[in-house]
Amino acid sequence: MPQKFPYVKLEEVALVRAGIPSREIDRPSEDGVIPVKVINPAALVGTYLSKVEGEDASLPGTVATRHCLKEGDILTPSRGVFRASLLEKEPELLSGGFQLVAGPLCHVVRVDAGKADPAYVAWVLSTPVAQAKMTASARGAAVRLYSRDALAEIDFPLPPIDLQRKLASAARDAQALMIARRDEARLELAITTQELSEILGFNA
């Protein structure tokens, strides 16, 4: 039988904020600027991110300090298909040496590690149940829009921290296996395509 665990709202275990406003990106500053990478929803390609592609931008030092991301931060899109992605390493290690900033179309979830495991929260937010809850709260017809408040109020079960970590580890392993199988399938497709092209004499 499934176990019963207390439910909490996301805002009880994490700080939830919007991404950087568009008006603050590439804003001139007399105090100099810091080069950063701005993450948009297209970069959120899995629950556990080991590499991040972002757009180049320059931010005043105070703005960069206020908006730059940290290891353990979770990003979700503010529109489109809802999903959640965890920064598993320091941002500079994910981006080739740049600080990272969540773009205007993202929300940032910074989990209090003393209350919950960030990897577990990222997994919970990626489940079909959480996605359905966010879809139900969305505004907009052609494109679903997710508010920061709706994200902050989403509720989910919170088991003991040790179990949170075990569940997150299992989810991480499953994602790694899926990626490995996908890469194998791509390689097999490339080999097959090459072989068939040789049969046709259709070679570069």
Predicted regions and their residues:
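Non-catalytic DNA-recognition/assembly elements of restriction-modification systems
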Residues: 1-29, 158-204
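Sequence-specific dsDNA recognition surfaces
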Residues: 11-26, 42-71
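Compositionally biased, charged N-terminal/linker segments
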Residues: 30-44
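Short hydrophobic-aromatic micro-motifs
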Residues: 37-40, 69, 74-77
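A short glycine-rich beta-alpha junction/loop motif
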Residues: 99-105, 139-165
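Short, positively charged
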Residues: 113-152
